[in-house]
């Protein structure tokens, strides 16, 4: 697949993502130097709560040298919780330029993403419907929210 705007090849991450999720000791991972500030204590607390509540379900992203590309806050939270292993997706096929572009894109994307109370309420209501359906033994989690 070719990127329409730049003409560059878009990597196919399907195989890499689905087949190569690995587990790392958080202390084996290194941080890439970033110009952006570190996460606040409040943000780390939120990461810890999410890991605790959802069993750390979201993998981090690492490069071929085990540098954290995405998920610094989750790694720090896992360390503070004393977690021995966390899931990671290695982007070993990325060049240095690819990684720089990926990180820049993720930082820019993060700056544009915002949440409102209304968005959170809608998400919560959807999750409550799914939970109720699952408890009722119905596998149909696509029901419309009233």
Label the predicted regions.
Residues 1-92, 99-146:
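Short, charged/polar connector segments at secondary-structure boundaries
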């Amino acid at each position: 697949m070719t990127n329409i705007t730049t003409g560059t090849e878009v990597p196919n991450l399907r195989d890499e993502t689905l087949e190569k999720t690995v587990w790392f000791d958080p202390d084996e991972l290194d941080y890439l130097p970033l110009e952006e500030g570190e996460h606040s204590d409040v943000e780390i607390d939120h990461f810890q709560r999410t890991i605790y509540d959802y069993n750390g379900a979201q993998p981090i992203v690492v490069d071929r040298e085990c540098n954290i590309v995405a998920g610094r806050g989750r790694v720090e939270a896992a360390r503070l919780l004393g977690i021995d292993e966390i899931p990671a997706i290695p982007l070993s096929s990325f060049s240095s330029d690819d990684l720089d572009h990926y990180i820049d894109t993720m930082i820019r994307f993060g700056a544009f993403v915002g949440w409102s109370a209304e968005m959170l309420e809608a998400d919560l209501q959807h999750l409550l419907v799914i939970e109720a359906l699952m408890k009722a033994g119905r596998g149909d989690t696509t029901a419309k929210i009233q």
